[in-house]
């Protein structure tokens, strides 16, 4: 669906006490989100789901433009934490889904211009998202996210800029604490207005980021490129080429115990001993074809392919690796992935009821070559750590899924509508063990998982300005290949005993337009069977288990208010009670305990003065309640509140040049806090510290060809 902001409305009396002090804003840009659960463009107000839109220009305003954690704090239900570890990516969770991840993103489906940033098995990453190119980011929560298939506890959809006339060149630089540098260039433009055959639009960007890192042994460098080229074939069809490449070389500082964190949060003793590090190279290309078949029928086909290569050195001691079944302390991965998603949309009437149908087929596949090596060598009788040694693992893994889906939207009356859909998700794994030596036997195997995923929402328009809705759906999450890759107690082979989880969600919500702004509220409950959680994590390696039954209950509130010209305030609050409903701790009972990695309360507020030119300034404050670090709830990261300030000046020089000079300070009051936790870390090294007060300055310069 396409989410747009429009229309001037009045506040329903039931919500007036909460927002009587505010007149919500007119949005300067059209925010969009394509949600296959509801075909066709409708407004955000009319969307029967919890969804939030973050504008790309807002993300870049006086910001480093390096991590999504800089700008997504205003999204309720989304917990985004910076590990200060570029080897392991950000920690993202939506309503608690994804909190178990010790690296990368799990439990959430991510897309960039329609291409999955989530692998077919459910493992995702944010490292290839170029903030300089972002047009908007949309976060979908609740039952309808399940219609995206496997591992979709939530959906994050990134849309990049489409070039328009007149052409523009932009260069920007940022320098911050800990020796952090980012330099970027971008070019956008078009040869026509995009409606005539032969019209071409383009958006090309590149950036380089380097940092010494806040902690010891946390330096990193990243090169990122993104390109989007569109060609209008005729008045009814368009072809879009998408290219993306990222190259990361990062040290891995690892986690700290509570005592180590208090003694010196910047230390990384084991990381330096083992020289833990990770390199990642990914290149992908996509081709999207859109055609209007008739006035009532549309066709869209997306094809993509890519390769991702990773080498990681872990802090695993020598002694465990002497076990002949141990896979070693160095991981080498080579992944090739591709897919195609084709869909047809029809608009018409059925039994005199206006209806939209979207049906399609989504096919994804990935092949992985996984090798493991010892992380030490012996030279002249001396053991040298942090070097690639003998081969200890060699396997070829295949994974693919084939998902047909159908979504419908029915408009029964002017006030009552129904959105409903179903997806049949089939996921297949196959592993071929090619390292059969001595006591290390053949650990080949295969598994397949199948599940019907229905979702439906009923919406009622109380007034033109106020909609209420109720929705329900079923989600499905298989283990990722990484989660299958290791068994407990150092056993060899894949963990095919790990089962997929299923989740049933119900939600009720209310959306109210005030002026041209929006106030949203949602209540939800999710019950999960066989939830996949971290069993034990040590030395950078994590094993997983099924936790039986869990429950998530919560509430989300958000508001966006413009109370005077160029002044804007945003607020969001999330309450999430996520608990085990059965024992996930073996001999010790943790039924009723909180699921680790999830904050029970999150709050955000920001105030900005942002005229199109001249002086601007902003401030924000974030609150995070304590986060349990293990299943037993015997360790936790304390709650914290941090504030940030930014200010800058935009100067237009003649008509073509725009200069933007800015500065910011984060963690204004120099709070000491934990940025994220490593769930169930076996040596109690749960804590990944966040930096104290830190600073940054930047300059952006653009030229528009008039």
Please state what every model-predicted region is:
Residues 108, 115-141:
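Short acidic/polar hinge/loop motifs at secondary-structure boundaries
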Residues 129-172:
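A beta-strand signature from Gram-negative outer-membrane beta-barrel systems
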Residues 168, 175-210, 215-253, 277-294, ...:
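Transmembrane beta-barrel wall of Gram-negative outer-membrane proteins
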Residues 195, 288-290, 298-316, 461, ...:
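Membrane-embedded beta-barrel scaffold of Gram-negative outer-membrane proteins
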Residues 238-244, 279-436, 461, 519-523, ...:
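Face-selective signature of the C-terminal outer-membrane beta-barrel domain
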Residues 244, 470, 506, 560, ...:
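Conserved C-terminal beta-signal and adjacent last beta-strands/turns
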Residues 249-263, 367-374, 428-437, 446, ...:
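Surface-exposed extracellular loop regions of Gram-negative outer-membrane beta-barrel proteins
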Residues 344-346, 351, 413-414, 426, ...:
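Gram-negative outer-membrane beta-barrel transporters
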């Amino acid at each position: 669906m396409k989410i747009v902001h429009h229309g001037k409305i009045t506040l329903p009396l039931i919500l007036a006490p909460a927002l009587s002090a505010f007149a919500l804003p007119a949005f300067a840009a059209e925010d969009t989100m394509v949600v296959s659960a509801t075909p066709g463009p409708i407004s955000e107000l009319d969307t029967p789901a919890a969804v939030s839109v973050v504008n790309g220009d807002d993300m870049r305003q006086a910001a480093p433009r390096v991590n999504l954690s800089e700008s997504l704090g205003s999204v309720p239900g989304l917990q985004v934490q910076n590990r200060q570890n570029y080897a392991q990516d950000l920690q993202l969770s939506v309503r608690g889904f994804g909190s178990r991840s010790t690296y990368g993103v799990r439990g959430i489906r991510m897309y960039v211009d329609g291409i999955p940033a989530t692998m077919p098995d459910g493992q995702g990453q944010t490292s290839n998202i170029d903030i300089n190119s972002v047009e908007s980011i949309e976060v979908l929560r609740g039952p309808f996210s399940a219609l995206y298939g496997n591992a979709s506890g939530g959906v994050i959809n990134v849309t990049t800029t489409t070039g328009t006339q007149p052409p523009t060149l932009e260069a920007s630089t940022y320098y911050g604490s800990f020796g952090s540098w980012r330099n970027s260039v971008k070019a956008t433009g078009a040869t026509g207005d995009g409606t005539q055959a032969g019209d071409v639009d383009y958006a090309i960007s590149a950036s380089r980021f380097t940092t010494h890192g806040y902690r010891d042994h946390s330096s990193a460098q990243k090169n990122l490129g993104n390109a989007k080229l569109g060609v209008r074939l005729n008045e009814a069809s368009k072809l879009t080429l998408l290219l993306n490449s990222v190259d990361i070389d990062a040290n891995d500082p690892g986690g700290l115990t509570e005592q180590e964190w208090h003694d010196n949060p910047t230390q990384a003793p084991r990381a330096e001993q083992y020289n833990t590090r990770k390199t990642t190279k990914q290149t992908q290309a996509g081709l999207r074809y859109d055609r209007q078949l008739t006035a009532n029928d549309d066709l869209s086909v997306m094809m993509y392919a890519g390769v991702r290569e990773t080498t990681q050195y872990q802090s695993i001691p020598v002694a465990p690796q002497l076990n002949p079944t141990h896979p070693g302390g160095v991981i080498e991965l080579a992944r090739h992935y591709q897919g195609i998603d084709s869909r047809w949309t029809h608009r018409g009437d059925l039994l005199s009821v206006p209806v939209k149908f979207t049906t399609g087929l989504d096919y994804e596949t990935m092949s992985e070559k996984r090798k493991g090596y010892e992380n030490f060598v012996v030279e002249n009788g001396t053991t040298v750590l942090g070097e690639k040694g003998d081969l200890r693992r060699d396997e070829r893994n295949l994974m693919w899924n084939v998902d047909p889906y159908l979504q419908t939207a029915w408009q029964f009356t002017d006030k009552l509508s129904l959105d409903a859909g179903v997806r049949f998700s089939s996921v297949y794994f196959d592993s071929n063990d090619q390292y059969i030596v001595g006591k290390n036997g053949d650990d080949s195997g295969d598994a397949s998982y199948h599940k019907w995923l229905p979702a439906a929402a009923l919406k009622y328009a109380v007034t033109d300005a106020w909609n209420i809705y109720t929705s329900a759906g079923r989600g499905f999450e298989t283990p990722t290949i990484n989660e299958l890759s290791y068994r407990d107690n150092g056993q060899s082979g894949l963990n095919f005993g790990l089962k997929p989880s299923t989740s049933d969600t119900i939600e009720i919500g209310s959306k109210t337009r005030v002026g041209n702004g929006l106030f949203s509220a949602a209540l939800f409950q999710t019950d999960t069977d066989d939830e996949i959680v971290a069993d034990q994590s040590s030395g950078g390696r994590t094993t997983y288990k099924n936790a039986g039954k869990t429950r998530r209950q919560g509430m989300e509130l958000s508001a966006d208010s413009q109370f005077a010209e160029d002044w804007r305030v945003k607020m969001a609050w999330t309450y999430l009670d996520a608990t085990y409903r059965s024992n996930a701790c073996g001999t010790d009972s943790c039924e009723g305990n909180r699921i680790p990695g999830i904050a029970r309360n999150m709050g955000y507020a920001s105030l900005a003065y942002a005229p199109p030119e001249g002086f601007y300034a902003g401030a924000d404050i974030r609150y995070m309640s304590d986060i349990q670090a293990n299943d037993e709830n015997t360790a936790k990261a304390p709650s914290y509140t941090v504030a940030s300030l930014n200010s800058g000046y935009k100067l237009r020089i003649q008509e073509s040049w725009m200069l933007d000079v800015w500065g910011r300070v984060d963690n204004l009051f120099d709070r000491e806090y934990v940025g994220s936790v490593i769930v169930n870390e076996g040596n109690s090294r749960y804590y990944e510290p966040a930096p104290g007060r830190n600073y940054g300055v930047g300059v952006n310069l653009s030229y528009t060809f008039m």
